[in-house]
Structure formats: structure tokens, C-alpha cells
Design a protein with these regions (language model features):
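Canonical tetratricopeptide repeat
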Residues: 58, 92-95, 126, 160-162, ...
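TPR alpha-solenoid repeat register
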Residues: 89, 123, 156-159, 193, ...
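Structural marker of alpha-solenoid helical repeat scaffolds
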Residues: 48, 82, 116-117, 150-152, ...
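Terminal, low-structured helical/coil segments at or just beyond the last alpha-helical repeat
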Residues: 24-44, 217-265
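N-terminal leader/linker segments that initiate helical-solenoid repeat arrays
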Residues: 20-77, 81
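Canonical positions in the second alpha-helix
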Residues: 78-79, 112-113, 146-150, 182-183, ...
Length: 265
């Protein structure tokens, strides 16, 4: 599932969070605050349905975490039955299909979610991420542009990082650097933006700058096959065989199957 590296963690985490908290708060009211007479959500069928919808999504996310994809899909489809116009049920189904290796099915569901929520930056960026990771980086930029149309979006930094990385894949290097630098201004520890900036510096032959970005990337998040391979490539270009050897050893020890992969793959 190569394209999963582009997905907004924000989206998945927010999606799961809708049902993770049992103390559901309405209208921002919490604790002992009151604005009217007490009543029970059990008296409101719409409120009950909304709570059940959130619970189905929570259960689906829980099952994904346990790799029980069959049960996860049952819960996600139950959520869809309660609210077929909400993008979150389709996003959850897309996550499940992607986790199971069904990239085409996941793409269809991400697009469905995007069509249902044309103003939601997180949902639009997820479909862009799927397009980018499945060989359509130029097309993905259209969806990232839609996601970035809202300057106040909570997903802006992640959308910029995704757009920058995918612009790099599309050969749009000037746009890539602009988007990535904007992303890092908003979120200096964004792992994907840092790794993409390291790739960008390599493309321009700026290996010392590339080293600085991969080092920041390794400090920001756990190592992956791709960033270790990138570090090896950069250190070899800088002539530091000792450093390259250390990363090769890490790659063999932490990701045995990744030791033979193409560094650009």
C-alpha cells in the first residue's frame, strides 16, 4: 500500500476520534455548564442515531487496529446505513479496503467521500493522496488545490506537505519546494514534508542541505525504509561511507525486506 504514506494521519485519527470519547459534548458545552433544562439524548431519535453512527465508526476503527477487516467493514457499512450522506463512513471503508490491499476499491470510496464533502480539506486531500500514490501525481494536485482553497483549514499543513511531495513526483519542482516550505512553516516537524524536502535537495544536487532535512526527518518520526534509503544515498554522494554504512546496517536490522529495494521506490 505505497500510497498510504501520503494519507493525512489527521484524517484517520479525527475519523476514529468521533467515537472514541464517550463523553460526547454538544455545542462545545462541557463539565458543569448548563444553558437550559436537563433532557436525555434518549428522547431525541436524531441524536440517538448520531451517537450510534459515531459508535459504529469507533468500532470499525478499533477492528482495523486489530486487523479484523471483515468486522471493521460491517461496522463501517452500518454507519453508512445510518447516514449515507456523510463522507466519514466512506472514508473509513476506504481505509479498510486500502489496509486489505484493495487499492482500486479504496480509490472509489475516497472519491465518493470527496464528492460528498467538496469543502472539507481533509477529505479532498485524502483522495488526492490516493491519486498521487497510484500513479497520478499531476491529477492529484487538482484535489490538493481544492483542499488548500480554505486558508483556515486545520488540515492545511498536511495538505501542503502532500501537495509538495506529489508535485515533486509530477516533476513540478518549483511548486514542490514552495508547498513544502509553506508546510514546514506551519508544521516544522511534518515528517513527510521533511523527507520530501530532502528528496528535492538531492534533485538539485544540494547534498549538505539534503542531509540537514533527512536528519530533521529522523528526529521527527520513526525511521522508514524510504528515509533510510534516502540517507544512504545522500551520505554516499557526500562521500561519507561510514555514515552510509551505519544506515545500511540499520536498514538490514530494522527492515530486512527493504534492504534490497530501490532507494527511489
Amino acid at each position: 500500500m505505497r500510497w498510504s504514506k501520503y494519507l493525512l494521519l489527521l484524517v484517520v485519527l479525527c475519523l476514529l476520534a468521533v467515537g472514541c470519547r464517550r463523553d460526547i459534548r454538544i455545542g462545545g458545552i462541557k463539565g458543569e455548564e448548563k444553558v437550559g433544562p436537563d433532557y436525555s439524548l434518549r428522547d431525541d431519535p436524531k441524536a440517538r442515531a448520531r451517537m450510534q453512527y459515531r459508535e459504529y465508526l469507533r468500532l470499525a476503527g478499533d477492528r482495523v487496529g486489530k486487523n479484523d477487516l471483515v468486522e471493521a467493514m460491517k461496522f463501517a457499512r452500518s454507519a453508512e446505513k445510518l447516514d449515507s450522506r456523510s463522507p466519514d463512513a466512506f472514508t473509513m471503508q476506504a481505509v479498510i479496503e486500502g489496509t486489505g490491499g484493495n487499492a482500486a476499491a479504496a480509490g472509489t470510496l475516497y472519491r465518493k467521500a470527496a464528492e460528498l464533502a467538496p469543502q472539507r480539506a481533509d477529505v479532498l486531500s485524502n483522495y488526492g493522496a490516493w491519486l498521487c500514490g497510484n500513479g497520478h501525481p499531476a491529477e492529484s494536485l487538482v484535489w490538493f488545490d481544492r483542499a488548500l482553497a480554505d486558508p483556515q483549514s486545520n488540515a492545511r499543513a498536511a495538505s501542503l506537505a502532500n501537495a509538495g511531495g506529489c508535485a515533486l513526483d509530477a516533476g513540478q519542482n518549483e511548486r514542490a519546494e514552495q508547498n513544502l516550505r509553506e508546510a514546514l512553516e506551519l508544521a516544522p516537524d511534518n515528517a513527510y514534508a521533511l523527507e520530501s524536502m530532502a528528496r528535492n535537495e538531492v534533485l538539485h544536487g544540494r547534498y549538505f542541505e539534503a542531509r540537514a532535512f533527512y536528519q530533521r526527518r529522523l528526529a521527527a518520526a520513526p525511521a522508514t525504509v524510504s528515509v533510510l534509503q534516502l540517507a544512504i544515498q545522500i551520505e554516499e554522494r557526500l562521500g561519507d561511507r561510514t555514515a552510509a554504512g551505519r544506515f545500511q546496517q540499520r536498514l538490514r536490522e530494522e527492515f530486512p525486506s527493504g534492504a534490497t529495494l530501490n532507494p527511489q521506490g
